[in-house]
Amino acid sequence: MTRTLLTDIAVATADHSKYGEEVLGLFRFKDETAFFEKASKIFPGVVLLETCNRVEILVHGSAKQLRDFLHGEQRFGFDILEGEAALMHLLELAAGTKSMIIGEDQILGQMRRALLLAESHDTNDVITDVCLNTAIREGVSIRQKTSINKGAVSIGSAAVLLAEELMGDLDGKNILVVGGGEMGTLVARALCEKNLRAIYVTNRSFDRAVLLAEEIKGRAMRLDQLYPCIALSDVVISCTGAPHLIIHADELAETMNERFWPLDLEPRHLLLIDIAQPRDIDDACRDVPGVSLKTLDDLKSISEKNLAARKTECEHADVLVKAALPEFIKAFNRAASGDLTKNLYTWAEEIRQREKNKALSRLRDADPYLESVIDDLTSALTKKLLEDAAKSIRASAECTDTQTAEILLKAIISGEVSCIRRSE
């Protein structure tokens, strides 16, 4: 098979399509700093993307290197793609065709944040950068050319649809949203469209809860009032970014004792929906009388309905993804050839300095002006001599003629005389 990429690229992926919520949690890296420190010793570029439905690792390196690294970290079961397949995967990811909720826009923001995270750890090189940025641009373009995201639901709004499905309707209900971040905002905005009695918002930062509550005309509650607020609610949707549990079974059981109407034999039913990753709600809560607990895995019914409704647009997006791949490969090879030519100029500069110093040592009485002239002359000659070769390397790479690009570079560096003519 002809090699079309000038350097190695690989992606490890684990997502909702293959693994349930609990198993997917085993693929995550709790200590991001440690992950980047270890990975950066192996790969020139590495990006980590973790969402509630997927874990993705993009590296400037080979599939074997990535697999060996993950096995060393006791992470088994990732699907690993390399070369063109890795680029195609990134395009599909950005287009929203691999999302649990087909066409959702949140993946684009998540990919941007993954880049920023890599940059903050100094692990984003020119190759990983061009991969993510090109994929994101194509994802935006595909949404503009199709209706794949028109009226599409997010994970947050899917949780609201699930609540509506399970409760019959949400008219006159009290809803508590736990978490005021991006996902909590999506949930709260989706709830605004319903005929609710009240929306409560609680968050670790009370100021953030107040801002969100003002936007949706709800009521902000301090986190220390969580359980009293649960006692008032019919549905609780939890979506914080906390690394620990927020709602515990024993405290919830005590709260349920406050949910009896006079003469009732059982507490009023409480629906809990946990869309956080890691989980916010203790799984033992499902054993508390009167409580139903739903998680990300339960959103699949909403996802399947969404996919059926967007089948035609998804097919259109797939066509556009395939059409975008050749230009993606050109952009990739352009970036990779930049690295190649940079190495070429570095090699040439070392030779220039060495030979210049030899010449100056023979001119024992050379004054600073003469030294400056010789330095300028050798520098200009080096750049002129390499200019055409560098252009040829870049042109060959962009045309996916990686073999010619590599032959040119090796021929120059090894001192071989090589003349490669292209037919017009």
From Swiss-Prot:
It is an enzyme of class 1 (oxidoreductase). The keyword Acetylation does not apply. Its EC number is 1.2.1.70. Keywords: NADP, Oxidoreductase, Porphyrin biosynthesis. GO terms for molecular function: glutamyl-tRNA reductase activity; NADP binding. The active site is at C52. Pathway: Porphyrin-containing compound metabolism; protoporphyrin-IX biosynthesis; 5-aminolevulinate from L-glutamyl-tRNA(Glu): step 1/2. The record marks H89 as: Important for activity. GO terms for biological process: protoporphyrinogen IX biosynthetic process from glutamate. SUPFAM superfamilies: Glutamyl tRNA-reductase catalytic, N-terminal domain, Glutamyl tRNA-reductase dimerization domain, NAD(P)-binding Rossmann-fold domains. Substrate binds at T51, C52, N53, R54, S99, E104, D105, Q106, Q110. NADP(+) binds at G179, G180, G181, E182, M183, G184. The keyword Repressor does not apply. It catalyses: (S)-4-amino-5-oxopentanoate + tRNA(Glu) + NADP(+) = L-glutamyl-tRNA(Glu) + NADPH + H(+). During catalysis, the active site Cys acts as a nucleophile attacking the alpha-carbonyl group of tRNA-bound glutamate with the formation of a thioester intermediate between enzyme and glutamate, and the concomitant release of tRNA(Glu). The thioester intermediate is finally reduced by direct hydride transfer from NADPH, to form the product GSA. Catalyzes the NADPH-dependent reduction of glutamyl-tRNA(Glu) to glutamate 1-semialdehyde (GSA). Belongs to the glutamyl-tRNA reductase family. Possesses an unusual extended V-shaped dimeric structure with each monomer consisting of three distinct domains arranged along a curved 'spinal' alpha-helix. The N-terminal catalytic domain specifically recognizes the glutamate moiety of the substrate. The second domain is the NADPH-binding domain, and the third C-terminal domain is responsible for dimerization. Homodimer. NCBIfam families: hemA (TIGR01035). This is Glutamyl-tRNA reductase.
